[in-house]
């Protein structure tokens, strides 16, 4: 792949619109895996996705021009999957499995378009919502976040000259490479790029992926970004997300249906995929409640992704649960992915080395760590905690509790109801930076 002069590319403002999203494959792989299941099982469910800025001190509507944001969102709505992309999805092997996507699903996907959006400004923030069929609104999550984060980066760098930009990117590259050198010291490390949604820019994410590919070789197992996986001949990686149990819980008509929602998701997932994709995401309504109510067959799955508890604490809890079910943790897999950086990767790796198989999904601190890189302090280059979550399903509010109360989303009354139902034990409040 041809190398891009990042500083010169940023400085050149001669185009009318520089599209941030140029392909519908510029998304996380698990969105396509989940989409196929949603298309097959829940085609008549409507779901609303909404932007949530957890770093409320950052006034996005003051930093990002509304006209530019609308232009980028409008451009994304013009995109369709290309013939080349459809051939790749149909013919490539994912997780050791050929034709993971059904021909009927791919035929439907070929004509898929991002639905309309609702955007307004309020108190220095943007209220951004996507209403419509779940099969369509789910595909907005990653592009919307990538657009807003990159527009914020562009606004922060708008007044920098070419030499300042050269210094900025030179320092960011050196900072990134110093992390690569530390990761090389961890034998048998398995790490992948999970950094699409809160990246500095698409081009910077591509640079980081190529740097990891060269810098740590086989320890770099792939990327969640489907377009980059295709373009760089890497594995496309990803399993499932919180939106699945959140929607099923919102649709529940009885207490039994609410309690069983996370496990029904797993049963559906196993029917569609199985094999290497049997990774449990346990924290939508708190990991403690998930483990307490889990059927015995959940212990037979390949592994867990503890996503919102401190990694060592969350990993230990799951290991103890496996042991209580008579399973050998050394044969199981833990995938750590919450706000990781090289320090937490090293600490977690050394803590669990030899006790369990490990994988690391490296996100925002891989693709958007520009702290201290600019010639002068620029707050707009600091990554923020921005998410796009499902907030409504068929008119019913959707809730995520998380193991960290700071990450809970949903109507406060519904959050309180879910806490009464699932319990509040072992949830630990932590500062959310990204």
From Swiss-Prot:
The organism's place on the tree of life at top rank: Bacteria
Keyword Phosphoprotein among UniProt keywords: yes
PTM comment text: Transiently phosphorylated on a His residue during the reaction cycle. Phosphorylation strongly increases the affinity for substrates and increases the rate of nicotinate D-ribonucleotide production. Dephosphorylation regenerates the low-affinity form of the enzyme, leading to product release.
InterPro entries for the chain: N/Namide_PRibTrfase (IPR041525), NAPRTase_N (IPR040727), Nic_PRibTrfase (IPR006406), Nic_PRibTrfase-Fam (IPR007229), Nicotinate_pribotase-like_C (IPR036068)
Pathway, per record: Cofactor biosynthesis; NAD(+) biosynthesis; nicotinate D-ribonucleotide from nicotinate: step 1/1
Annotated EC: 6.3.4.21
Role this protein plays: Catalyzes the synthesis of beta-nicotinate D-ribonucleotide from nicotinate and 5-phospho-D-ribose 1-phosphate at the expense of ATP.
Protein name, per record: Nicotinate phosphoribosyltransferase
